[in-house]
Amino acid sequence: MFAVRVGLQKFNIAHKFEIASIITLYANWIREGKLKVNSDWNKERQIKFTVQDPCQLVRKTFGDPMAEDLRYVTKAVVGEENFIDMTPNRSNNYCCGGGGGFLQNGMPEARRAFGKLKADQIKATGATYCITPCHNCHAQIHDLSEHYEGGWHNVHLWTLICLSMGILGENEREYLGDDLKEMDVLFNREEDVST
């Protein structure tokens, strides 16, 4: 989105469309009652979540309103009491160290060293899961957890939306920990599909 937005501005390209993130759409749909999520599944479990504010999405493109939408959706699906924010956060959040091509550049030691600050930041929250709405952040933060033995799982926002709606499919459980991987939700069993 950042490249499209900057490209349109830089080359003064006329357009009749609005650039929006799926996160803002999720937030709007939840506010309007079109996306019916809830956090009941996590009331007793009390699994803690934090979020990564992607540089390209928050700081460089949409700013803190995007970060607020991300938190709104997260709290709606995991419960406000189960959300732990990183410090610093929003537009001031630390870079994960995997963006700008660094993830694919073949220098994992340097990438991990740069990402150590992010790993320590996530660890400090005590959260079991880090929600990563950016592909590069997702891959980097997953690697950081394994490399630095962080103990957290990282997960896509969509996975938690599906879980909160009771429609989490078998193929959407790859990044979940054992605490959620086997969670029994609608359409998880054959008898659910037939009813």
Regions from the PLM with identified roles:
Residues 1-195:
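Iron-sulfur cluster-binding electron-transfer modules in prokaryotic oxidoreductases
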